[in-house]
C-alpha cells in the first residue's frame, strides 16, 4: 500500500514538473514574440529590406556626411515639422491623414508605421527621413503624388537606381577580392549593392516634384 502511494506521489510530482517546463518554455516564446511586436527595429534587423544610410556610408562617406547635415536627414526628426504637422492635423480634424508623413517619413509610411507613432517607436530608417533608398530605390516616374510612390524593398545587395553617369561600378566589381567587398550574403567583405541600374529621371526636377510641389 505504501509502495503504491509512493508511486502515485512520484507520478504526480513528475506531472507537475513536466507542466512547469512547458509553462516556462511557453513564457519564453511569448516574451520573444512580445519583444518582436514591441521593438520597431526587430523586423528590419531580421529582414533588412530597407537599408539604413549608415550602411551606405561604408563606401559613400563624403555623400553620407553631406546628407547627415541636410534638411532631408532632419525631415523626420525636426521638432518644427512635428509641431506644424500636428497643428494641421488638428485643424483638419484628422482628414489630412498621412499627407505630411508620406514625404517626411516615406520609408516608415511604406513599412506600415502609423502616422501617430512617436519617433522612439519608429524604425531607424524611418527616423532618417529622406534617406538613401527614398530616392535610389525608386524605379518609376510618379509625378505629383505627395510622396505616394513605391520604394523597392531589398537588402543592401539589391540593385540601386541612379543616373549611372561616370559610374565606375563595373571596374569595382572586377576588383572585388582586392577591395574586399561582397555583393551577396554568401561572400565575405564590405556589403555593397550588386548592381547599378540607370534611371534618368532621378537627375531631373520632375523626380523631386513627387514631394516638392
Q: Could you say what each language-model-derived stretch is?
A:
Residues 1-10:
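N-terminal secretory signal peptides that target proteins for export/translocation
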Residues 4-5, 15, 58:
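The N-terminal extracellular segments of secreted preproproteins, especially immediately downstream
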Residues 29-128, 133, 140-203, 207-213:
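Sequence context of c-type cytochrome heme-c attachment sites
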